[in-house]
């Protein structure tokens, strides 16, 4: 079956949790979380939960576990904490929670970042995606430019298709 056929069979609405990983952002100042919500809802997806989470491994793991156990969440979208600073723990928390990794997400994100946005600074990004307990997980940097790139060029175009693949054998 072709990719186009898969996309035709994919769910049109995906129920999403947004997690902004930050020690400083608030609901009033979180432009990236707001942008994720706006882009998802513009394409007919639902945001069922939105949280700002401290950039601490245990806190991120906690929210991934909560989301994995909820029937009203299909996908988890994280932004922030993907760099190489000591406090950046999102990559490790997500990686350690995945049943299956989708390495192509990070690879394509860094390629597009290099080509269209930040040049060689793309090597600092540790964007990651995968599957846990039947939920798609996408983790991207926290800048609005990175969020827009990841959402419009990768996540939104493939979200339904990813969910179709996750759910087809269940």
UniProtKB/Swiss-Prot annotation:
Entry keyword Membrane: no
Alphabetical UniProt keywords: Molybdenum cofactor biosynthesis
Swiss-Prot/TrEMBL GO biological process terms: Mo-molybdopterin cofactor biosynthetic process
Xref: SUPFAM superfamilies: Molybdenum cofactor biosynthesis proteins
The UniProt record lists the keyword Endoplasmic reticulum: no
InterPro entries found in the cross-reference section: MoaB, MoaB/Mog-like_dom_sf, MoaB/Mog_dom, MoCF_biosynth_CS
Gene Ontology terms: cellular component: cytosol
A Pfam family hit: MoCF_biosynth
Pathway this chain belongs to: Cofactor biosynthesis; molybdopterin biosynthesis
Functional summary from the UniProt entry: May be involved in the biosynthesis of molybdopterin.
UniProt record similarity statement: Belongs to the MoaB/Mog family.
PANTHER family named in the record: MOLYBDENUM COFACTOR BIOSYNTHESIS PROTEIN B
Record's protein name: Molybdenum cofactor biosynthesis protein B
Organism encoding this protein: Halalkalibacterium halodurans (strain ATCC BAA-125 / DSM 18197 / FERM 7344 / JCM 9153 / C-125)
